[in-house]
UniProtKB/Swiss-Prot annotation:
The keyword Nuclease does not apply. This is Replication enhancer protein. GO terms for biological process: viral process. Homooligomer. Interacts with the replication-associated protein (REP). Interacts with host proliferating cell nuclear antigen (PCNA). Interacts with host retinoblastoma-related protein 1 (RBR1), and may thereby deregulate the host cell cycle. Oligomerization and interaction with PCNA are necessary for optimal replication enhancement. Belongs to the geminiviridae replication enhancer protein family. Pfam families: Gemini_AL3. Keywords: Host-virus interaction. Increases viral DNA accumulation. Enhances infectivity and symptom expression. Transmembrane segments: none annotated. It comes from Tomato yellow leaf curl virus (strain Israel). The lineage of its organism: Viruses, Monodnaviria, Shotokuvirae, Cressdnaviricota, Repensiviricetes.
Length: 134
């Protein structure tokens, strides 16, 4: 859903993409929170934010695009190492597809968390997407 207007994002908007080789560093990855074994539970909670950079947003007609993922995992990774592996695997998957779009980034994250990395318990996704009016 577009955060500014409240309208649902259409399928053509979600699938609208850019060839990966046309833009350098198209995505920005950031770990916003890493709770290690909270409340004596046997899993970590890692929050990752993926931001589309200015050049890809300009081509796709997007004002703002943040994808936030909250990951429950039984792995005990170091924060920097997890981010490095996660980023590498997501970009590798997108490179194999050849096109970066909102849906392809979500597919790439799903592939990495459930097929590449082991011990993923649950993932929740929230987003802040705003399309340009003009």
């Amino acid at each position: 859903m577009d955060s500014r207007t409240g309208e649902l994002i259409t399928a053509p908007q979600a699938e609208n993409g850019v060839f990966i080789w046309e833009i350098n560093n198209p995505l920005y990855f950031k770990i916003t929170e890493h709770s290690q074994r909270p409340f004596l539970m046997n899993h970590d909670i890692i929050s990752i934010q993926i931001r589309f950079n200015h050049n890809i947003r300009k081509v796709m007609g997007i004002h703002k695009c943040f994808l936030d993922f909250r990951i429950w995992t039984t792995l005990q990774p170091q924060t920097g190492h997890f981010l490095r592996v996660f980023r590498y695997e997501v970009l590798k998957y997108l490179d194999s597809l050849g096109v970066i779009s909102i849906n392809n980034v979500i597919r790439a994250v799903d592939h990495v968390l459930y097929d590449v990395l082991e011990n993923t318990i649950n993932v929740t996704e929230t987003h802040d997407i705003k399309y340009k009016f003009y």
